[in-house]
Amino acid sequence: PKADPRELPFGIGLAIFSRTPLRDRTRRDLPSPPIEFIFDGRRTTPTDRLLIGARTTVGGRDIQLFNTHLLAFFMLGASSEEHRGQRDLLATELGASRLPTLLTGDFNVSRHGSLVAQLARSGFSTVQERAVTWRRRPYVLDHIFYNAPLRPVWHAVEPTLASDHHALVADFEFAVAAGGV
């Protein structure tokens, strides 16, 4: 995200990694509402978040990739159901995609069913919504959302020492369209 003096000391970073070349990179700021909270003895408000994107080609077919890390409203005594701005911007971006699309990230929604339902209205499913992905509380915070041109063939939640979140990994194939095309 853009530089902000309010950023907490651990920072937030996003990346998209691919075995195939990335192109048409995008970034979209996801504004955070001015919810006040106390951190390290001082009153502050949350920093904005980010949605990054890129396109790549796999097997001769273009794919749109997105990654995000949304605000953890539940840690501020609020919820993304009350403050829907970041989620609504994601849903709009996904709804505009005309390509096979993957959206990955830490969505920080403690009651993730409402997020899954919202993105389903934009034509997206998540590869899983049962296995806990965060070590600190039994929440499913991390997701891989995909649209109908793609079909998941395998997924797993793998413990890792690299993060306080477990790694969510998945393999996809292109779904065969009606008429075998």
Q: How does the language model describe each region?
A:
Residues 5-11, 81-89, 175-181:
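N-terminal, active-site-proximal structural segment of metallo-dependent hydrolase catalytic domains
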Residues 20-22, 30-33, 70-73, 108-110, ...:
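Short, solvent-exposed loop/turn segments at secondary-structure junctions
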Residues 36-38, 73-77:
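A short acidic, helix-capping loop that chelates divalent metal ions and anchors anionic groups
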